[in-house]
């Protein structure tokens, strides 16, 4: 993912992505560069424009994006139920009429 992000940063800067530019971005971020991974990214993306890659990724996210909010909502509802249940389980405090503990008798 770091290698693809570095590729994207170079492309978004207006430059044509090159292996040297991607390696420079990774080194600037403190990543130990693996040349074989850089090569793999460039082999996978060969002949594809960055704009086309973004459009393709966006289309994939739209197709699967509807499930995420439902999961988050059900998680929030479950957490609220646990909190409500915990509040019910707390024992009621007994009222002490003698709060002075006999200090001023």
UniProtKB/Swiss-Prot annotation:
Name this polypeptide is given: Large ribosomal subunit protein P2
One GO cellular component, as annotated: cytosolic large ribosomal subunit
Chain's role: Plays an important role in the elongation step of protein synthesis.
Coiled-coil stretches: none
GO-annotated biological processes: cytoplasmic translational elongation
Keywords: Phosphoprotein, Ribonucleoprotein, Ribosomal protein
PANTHER family named among the record's database cross-references: 60S ACIDIC RIBOSOMAL PROTEIN FAMILY MEMBER, ACIDIC RIBOSOMAL PROTEIN P2, PUTATIVE-RELATED
Record flagged with keyword Transmembrane helix: no
InterPro entries in the record: P1/P2_N_sf (IPR038716), Ribosomal_P1/P2 (IPR027534), Ribosomal_P1/P2_euk (IPR001859), Ribosomal_P2 (IPR044076)
Gene3D superfamilies on file: 1.10.10.1410
